[in-house]
Amino acid sequence: MALYNPYRSDMVATLGETTGFVARQLMLYRMKQDPVGREILRLQPRVKSWTVDLNEMRSLQEGTFGREYARFMDDNGLDQDSRDDVKFVDDIELAYVMQRYRDIHDFTHTLTGLPTVSVAGEIAVKWFEMVQTGLPMCTLGSIFGPLNPEVTPKHREQLRSYYIPWALSNGMKAKFIMNVFYERHFEEPIDSLRKKMNLTPARRLDGW
């Protein structure tokens, strides 16, 4: 079910934790090679309602990363506390790597400009995350997700012709998403942060 339906967050979370040991090790290694990544591992920040105040984000200047993140959460009716905690990864460091990946998912949506209101939007993000992280759950979701009956033929064609090539290109050239301390960039213009990350947001095609 998790392969076809990225909305089943419980099953997606379980699949992510029970697969991908080697990918998590590589993610941890890449974080340890980067000064910001090391700081994130040391401080282990979480993205929860008590750590990131959406009311404060809503009050930020238009066009800032924090304001756009709050808008994304509001527009999609999302809850910061809905992300499951990691349960099936025993190693403390590797468990946090998985948790951080999960916690920043909505930051990734915000920065890439990809919607979460459709299965197709989640599939496009999974392609980007697959290239960035190598996690099997992202790979499987990328491959099998388009077979979901909720993905319309039009969206399937748009994935093939634009969003998947966009995800592959940006996934390879963009800064490693795990090595960005997003919480320190809320007051920065979102386009400035994208530039620092070498990330080009996806265009919104018709129907997205």
Curated annotation (Swiss-Prot):
Keyword Membrane listed: yes
InterPro entries for the chain: Coq4, Coq4_euk
Pathway per the UniProt entry: Cofactor biosynthesis; ubiquinone biosynthesis
Catalytic activity, as annotated: a 4-hydroxy-3-methoxy-5-(all-trans-polyprenyl)benzoate + H(+) = a 2-methoxy-6-(all-trans-polyprenyl)phenol + CO2
Keywords (A to Z) from UniProt: Lyase, Membrane, Metal-binding, Mitochondrion, Mitochondrion inner membrane, Ubiquinone biosynthesis, Zinc
The keyword Cytoplasm belongs to this UniProt entry's keyword annotation: no
UniProt cross-references to Pfam families, sorted A to Z: Coq4 (PF05019)
Protein localization: Mitochondrion inner membrane
Binding site for Zn(2+): 105-106, 109, 122
Topology within the bilayer: Peripheral membrane protein
Cofactor(s) it depends on: Zn(2+)
Any one GO cellular component localisation term in the record: mitochondrion
Chief localization: mitochondrion
BP-aspect Gene Ontology terms: ubiquinone biosynthetic process
Function: Lyase that catalyzes the C1-decarboxylation of 4-hydroxy-3-methoxy-5-(all-trans-polyprenyl)benzoic acid into 2-methoxy-6-(all-trans-polyprenyl)phenol during ubiquinone biosynthesis.
Name by which UniProt lists this protein: Ubiquinone biosynthesis protein COQ4 homolog, mitochondrial
Species in which this protein is naturally found: Nematostella vectensis
